[in-house]
A protein has these predicted regions:
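Bacterial signal peptide processing site
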Residues: 34-36
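Sec-exported extracytoplasmic/periplasmic mature domains
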Residues: 76, 105-106, 124, 179-183, ...
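Conserved C-terminal helix/tail region of periplasmic/extracytoplasmic solute-binding proteins
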Residues: 328-355
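N-terminal secretory signal peptides
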Residues: 1-12, 16-31
Length: 355
């Protein structure tokens, strides 16, 4: 299991931002982006017997990670000849956000499920050319350790914590939470390039403490019974937000649409949103059945890991005011840490759909 697929579903790096920002200069000559993705759910999802000739073809791009897990039931529905949908849907799954963003910017993708900060980057790059439809995934990070004395963030004081994502959102999130807990100066963050390296440290040292994304956290716990995940950073963020009096949440993934497509095909966008919302509800209520679909779509290899990881992925469909409340404050935290992580400036109000 490669870590980049799931790390990339949480963040876009500074390097990734610069590569996207340079598309205009480079003439957007990135013909290989589509080749790196994997077409998914295409059988019966193009115009067929169940779709009228006046239907709209909707091109959806997403990532092989938590941001797509909540969509798998809708993907399965769209692939059926008896889907009952008015429009046709094609899905492309990629392993990194940097593969999806050029396609979205060029207009080759209509709707995309991408990291929250990447959505802000694209908004700025396109001068407000995309709209955020919803938050689809909250936090997917957990503190993992065999040290039973660790039960809260304050217990990390004086400790070393191993994690991935130096110079990207995991580092900014961790710094924010440690500062909120009043222990920022007493915790050492040691970064690894791969989540598997963090798992290796946890396996070899029973006193080690790590921060892992899903599904790596679930997989690590399944392989090593001594490990536990005592702190869910999504819950820790909620506590910090409550203390500071804001409504922000720890956000991993969002769904965006090109404004040109939204203006031309509002009914298709609404149908997608309805299907996505129902899909998230299905996945959360039926993790065992959903796990099978997760494997079928090539997101994970193990149904057992998928089933256990689903509850920890915090799959949601936050729209309207809840969307803006959750996302705006999160982007503000990232902006304060590194403005380039959100594209240089924070999105204006028109970024938030029906907020």
């Amino acid at each position: 299991m490669k870590s980049n697929a799931f790390d990339s579903s949480m963040m876009i790096s500074r390097r990734g931002f610069l590569s996207v920002a340079g598309l205009g200069i480079m003439g957007i000559a990135l013909t290989g982006c589509g080749a790196k993705g994997t077409a998914a759910g295409t059988k019966g999802s193009t115009a067929g017997s169940a779709v009228s000739s006046s239907s709209t073809s909707v091109r959806v791009a997403s990532l092989k990670g938590p941001t797509t897990i909540g969509l798998v039931h809708f993907m399965d529905q769209a692939a059926s000849k008896d889907s009952g949908l008015a429009n046709s849907y094609s899905f492309t799954l990629s392993t990194a956000a940097d593969e999806v963003l050029p396609s979205l910017i060029k207009g080759d993708t209509d709707i995309a499920l991408i990291p929250a900060n990447a959505a802000s980057v694209v908004y700025n790059k396109t001068k407000g050319g995309v709209t955020c439809l919803n938050v689809n995934t909250l936090g997917v990070l957990s503190v993992v350790t065999a040290d039973t004395s660790i039960t809260s963030l304050k217990d990390l004081a004086g400790k070393t914590v191993y994690l991935t994502g130096k110079g990207t959102t995991p580092e900014y999130v961790m710094n924010y939470l440690l500062d909120a807990a009043g222990i920022a100066g007493s915790v050492t963050l040691e970064f690894k390039s791969e989540a598997t390296e963090v798992v290796s440290v946890l396996t070899s040292d029973p006193t080690a403490i790590g921060v892992l994304p899903q599904p790596f956290a679930t997989a690590a716990l399944a392989k090593n019974q001594a490990l536990a995940a005592p702190i869910d950073l999504t819950d820790a963020w909620n506590e910090a937000a409550e203390q500071s009096g804001d409504d922000s949440q720890l956000v991993t993934g969002v769904t965006v649409v090109r404004n040109e497509f939204l203006d031309e095909h509002p009914e298709a966008v609404e149908e997608f949103l309805k299907g996505q919302s129902a899909s998230v509800e299905y996945v959360n209520e039926h993790p065992e059945k959903a796990a099978k679909l997760v494997v079928e779509q090539g997101i994970l290899e193990s149904e057992a890991v998928a089933q256990k990881a689903i509850p920890a992925c915090h799959l949601v469909c936050l729209t309207g005011k809840k969307l803006k409340q959750a996302l705006a404050g999160y982007l503000e935290v990232l902006y304060r840490a590194d403005a380039s992580s959100v594209g240089g400036t924070l999105p204006a109000d028109d970024f938030y759909y029906q907020a």
